[in-house]
Amino acid sequence: MENQKENLFSEPHKRGLVKSPLQESSKANVVLAEIQPDLGPLTTPTKPKEVSQGEPWTPTANLKMLISAVSPEIRSRDQKRGLSDNRSGLPEARDCLHEPQAKTNEKSQPSRKEKSLGLLCHKFLARYPKYPNPAVNNDICLDEVAEELDVERRRIYDIVNVLESLHMVSRLAKNRYTWHGRHNLTKTLGTLKSVGEENKYAEQIMMIKRKEHEQEFDFIKSCGLEDHHVIKSTAGQNGHSDMCFVELPGVEFRAASANSRKDKSLRVMSQKFVMLFLVSTPQIVSLEIAAKILIGEDHVEDLDKSKFKTKIRRLYDIANVLSSLDLIKKVHVTEERGRKPAFKWTGPEISPNNSGSSPVMPLTASLEAEQSAKENCAKNLFSTRGKPSFTRHPSLIKLVKSIENDRRKISSAPSSPVKSSKAESSQNSPPVPNKMAQLAAICKMQLEEQSSEPRKRVKVNLTRSGHYKPLAPLDPAVNTELELLAPSLIQPLGMVPLIPSPLSSAVPVILPQAPSGPSYAIYLQPAQAQMLTPPHGLSPTVCPTQSSNATGSKDPTDAPTEKTATDATKPGSLQPAPERQGAKNRSKETTGDRGTKRTGALEDGGPGPIKKPKEDLKALENVPTPTTLFPSGYLIPLTQCPSLGPDPMLSNTENSGTLSPNHRIYGSPIAGVIPVASSELTAVNFPPFHVTPLKLMVSPTSMAAVPVGNSPALSSSHPAPTQNPSSAIVNFTLQHLGLISPGVQMSASPGPGAGTVPLSPRVEADNLSSRQGRATIHDSPVLGQSQLNGQPVAGTGAQQPVPVTPKGSQLVAESFFRTPGGPTKPTSSSFMDFDGANKTSFGTLFVPQRKLEVSTEDVH
């Protein structure tokens, strides 16, 4: 159909005369038959039927027949000879087909002898002179040589590698070498002999021969594990895997990639093979011994048969090239087990003393001097006069990799627990407490025992109180919102309260409960400001900070940086009950001895330093900032006061001593008030309640720690006089703050006690105003100070150049608050009156109702 379509397309004028397909196809065949004699190569011979009748004699003849049937060249050649000659007979036809193919195969494929490496090496060496002229270009192009010799280039590479091991050629670039000839051959052989002696190849050869004579086993069994260990011990460091390519100092490779090719197996094996001949006493080496030394018994055991045979073939290739160089000659060693192939050295004799080259002599001396692991490297085999060729052995690469892996493992390993514990201990150590944060830690540790919500709120307020912010003057219209704005309350520069309270209903409580013995000081923190208006119009001033007292700093500006609080981990922060009982017993002694006893108790109770009177006076004079003192509530045992920290917990003993040499009083080491700038006096009103003459049951030892509201500095000139709060309000507040237990009741109204005289703040203020004519402010944040033996003592303000001691004498009123669980002893009551002159508005105090119990102790 295709022919029909082609005919129709090629001859459109005959479309009307189209005949049947059979007639068209027969007509096309006739046309092809007419053209066939002209197309000789394309015709199919008529011989295949006759040839197929006979069977080929061999598989090779059959393959040739198939090739002749397919190949168009064979068909055309047969066609030229004539088709008639093919019909004469099958044998003649087969001979005609076999003879030309055999001739072409002989021309294309050389014989086995012609392909031998030895003959090829002879042809290669015949192209170049033995001693070339260095001034002439002696470059060799391997591609050109392979083409001229009609061999593969890899065969030329085998020859060149062996010649390069003897430094007869040197590599220039890819497929390009420089011919050196035999100029350096003697020098090279001398160097190789010295290296072979260093490697103790002669001893290895003798050992292997002795083992072979002793044992009558085959090749593998004759060198068992014993030989393996001996050979490994002698040649393990100098064996094939640990030896570098030996170079001459005068023949350096100029190509950049030369160093990467220096550890080729054929070149290194060739040098070691030559060493065996040079060091052996009868310079005859069999391939068996050479294989054991060069390849190694461990490699023989590890490698399979094919790989081992490949190594043996490489030795044969090296031997063929060396034979072409007339350095060795093949001989046969006759032994009991038969003949073995061996080679005898026929090259130049190299003596160990004069190895034919001057550089070898200093080399041996340097090798003897330096017995190190680098003696196997090529650069140690030559003098340093020439340019050193640095090579890196594969073993060094493995060593570097192992070191890098070890470093990676060490760096990625987690830190040891010892280091972490040390780090933790260093972090937990209190080198510089962070201001009020350590006091917060104390409260937190004590409050963990309490599960009630109010104490949790106390801890929250305690942590909030560590930030100091300036308090903007508040509008009287927003007095009810003061509690929300309380976190902005700040001390003036140089003022450090014990805990800057945010004026919330929750008060930080230190040691809310104690099982036994010690005296406690209770500090009330109402949410109101107690105004301090000194008489005669003198503006109240604030005492220097506790940090200034503790450190003896003269500059009040250094106080914020020097403020440190107590650390919960200090040993003296929590004293056992015996020490507390001791403090109680000491408090019952005479009044004259009480000062020194109290000083010893404070010094023994903790590490808080006692400041000097001169430093205190200087600190008093350096802080002129006027403030308003806010009473704040705390419950702190007096024996713990000096141990709570040097800054806010400093005792007032020495300060009091400076005020009155004759009367030593011991003020509170605890800050009981919160100072506020005097510019904010008129803008602060606190709704819950205010401090009025409040009677607290106290012990003698706790007298100095109670904030007394009847300070001479307090004036009754406030425009809004205060009211005395009822006992219920005080009890509510104390219970809500966790300062007292429900079973303890506290009186808030003034009343006489046995052997005590309540201090009248008004009378005291008027008395001091009339006598002194100046205001006195305490040098600690404690709102008031106690009086011992009827001697009232007032703190001095910054405006006073000299401290003033009141001349009036009154009985000492020591206040003490007994926590639940402490020892109680019903004795005559002593009271401390809080000032009730200043009147402020009351606010609603939402606190739970609890029962209060108050126990007293004898003052004397």
Curated annotation (Swiss-Prot):
Gene3D superfamilies: Winged helix-like DNA-binding domain superfamily/Winged helix DNA-binding domain. Homodimer and heterodimer: mainly forms homodimers and, to a lesser extent, heterodimers with E2F8. Dimerization is important for DNA-binding. Interacts with HIF1A. Atypical E2F transcription factor that participates in various processes such as angiogenesis and polyploidization of specialized cells. Mainly acts as a transcription repressor that binds DNA independently of DP proteins and specifically recognizes the E2 recognition site 5'-TTTC[CG]CGC-3'. Directly represses transcription of classical E2F transcription factors such as E2F1: component of a feedback loop in S phase by repressing the expression of E2F1, thereby preventing p53/TP53-dependent apoptosis. Pfam families: E2F_TDP (PF02319). One of its GO terms (molecular function) is identical protein binding. In contrast to classical members of the E2F transcription factor, atypical members contain 2 DNA-binding domains and regulate transcription in a DP-independent manner. Both DNA-binding domains are required for DNA-binding and are proposed to form an intramolecular structure that is similar to the winged helix structure of the E2F-DP heterodimer. The modification Phosphoserine is found at residues 71, 412, 416. The keyword Nucleus applies. Its main location: nucleus. GO terms for biological process: cell cycle comprising mitosis without cytokinesis; chorionic trophoblast cell differentiation; fibroblast proliferation; hepatocyte differentiation; negative regulation of cytokinesis; negative regulation of transcription by RNA polymerase II; placenta development; positive regulation of DNA endoreduplication. Transmembrane segments: none annotated. Belongs to the E2F/DP family. Residues 1-114, 407-433, 533-616 are annotated as: Disordered. Residues 542-554 have a biased composition (Polar residues). Residues 74-84, 92-114, 555-565, 586-596 have a biased composition (Basic and acidic residues). InterPro entries: E2F, E2F_WHTH_DNA-bd_dom, WH-like_DNA-bd_sf, WH_DNA-bd_sf. One of its GO terms (cellular component) is RNA polymerase II transcription regulator complex. Residues 411-426 have a biased composition (Low complexity). It comes from Rattus norvegicus. SUPFAM superfamilies: Winged helix' DNA-binding domain (SSF46785). It comes from the Eukaryota. Keywords: Activator, Cell cycle, DNA-binding, Nucleus, Phosphoprotein, Repressor, Transcription, Transcription regulation. The keyword Cell cycle applies. Residues 112-181, 261-347 bind DNA. This is Transcription factor E2F8.
